[in-house]
């Protein structure tokens, strides 16, 4: 009976290890943007602003708490896809007028000068995430707009990282 009791939890651990689902993490990092993408193969890609370095303590935490096969570092992109979800990142340029694109998540970075109410009219079924690179006054204004329009809002400054699977 003992071999069965030991083998069952071990097999569940192996199944979980081999079936990691891809995920995108939007981190809170003061005055900058940091995303991490986990592939199904447990490869991690850290996305930062151009010429921005990843804090060593964050890398150490990921290495100790996650099963990491490989780590990469790339510059942030405006559009990400995780499983069937599309993520649009709007930075200080405020460019989002994409007619045939309907993102599931919108990440606001570097305090873009946008009319959030107008943008939410264009993308009514989206979730809004504000990362740590935004001014607090902008984040407060966006949060009240989302609350008024009943759109889910996540502030990484208050609630920590956001995970999209």
What are the functions of these language-model segments?
Residues 30-165:
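Extracytosolic and intramembrane catalytic regions of membrane-associated proteins
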């Amino acid at each position: 009976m003992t071999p069965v009791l030991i083998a069952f939890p071990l097999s569940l651990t192996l199944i979980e290890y081999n079936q990691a689902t891809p995920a995108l993490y939007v981190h809170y990092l003061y005055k900058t943007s940091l995303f991490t993408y986990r592939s199904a193969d447990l490869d991690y890609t850290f996305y930062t602003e151009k010429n921005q370095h990843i804090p060593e303590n964050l890398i150490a935490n990921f290495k100790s708490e996650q099963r990491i096969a490989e780590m990469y570092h790339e510059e942030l992109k405006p559009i990400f896809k995780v499983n069937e979800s599309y993520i649009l990142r709007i930075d200080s340029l405020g460019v989002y007028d994409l007619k045939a694109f309907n993102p599931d998540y919108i990440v606001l970075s570097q305090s873009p000068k946008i009319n959030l109410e107008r943008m939410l009219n264009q993308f009514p079924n989206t979730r809004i995430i504000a990362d740590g690179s935004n001014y607090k006054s902008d984040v407060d204004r966006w949060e009240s707009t989302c609350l008024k329009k009943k759109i889910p809002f996540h502030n990484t400054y208050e609630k920590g990282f956001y995970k999209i699977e």
